[in-house]
Amino acid sequence: MDLLSLRTAIQSTLNSVLGTYTLANGATTPAISVRAPGESLPAGTTVSGLEVVIVREPELVPVRQYKNEQAFSRWTLYLVDWAGTNSLQDVAGDLLWAYPGSNAVSINVPRGVGPRSQMRVDITTNPETHV
């Protein structure tokens, strides 16, 4: 699965709970983005509600087989609740149901600063064969 397909599928799965990005020009868009580690949102962009951040590059997990090398792609997502109104366990559950073999872990966040809660979700997609 490529990055665009994954992003589209996740947005479709979580559409009813996604928050909103408000861009510097006032336009709004669903709060789902693809970023490299350490990359931030464009200047002037604000977030409200549930944000989903997909890490741009997947981790490759090798599967050893006779005469074929395969690798699962493990995509990392961060669910970030900026409003404190979402149950991240329920949101992560929707993703785990849609992508069997995936897992989710809560991340501690400082109280009173930034997001209310955060989870990391690792989604594993089908292997690609490399001969």
Predicted feature residues:
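Acidic-leaning, charged glycine-interspersed low-complexity segments
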Residues: T20-L23, Q89-V131
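Oligomerization/assembly interface segments of phage tail-like spikes and tubes
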Residues: K67-G84, S117-V131
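Small/polar-rich, solvent-exposed N-terminal microdomains that initiate assembly or binding
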Residues: M1-Q65, T85-Q89, G112-R116
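Generic preference for well-ordered secondary structure
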Residues: G38, V61, L79, V105-I107
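Functionally constrained cores in energy, signaling, and assembly domains
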Residues: G49-E51, S73-W75, D81, Y99-P100
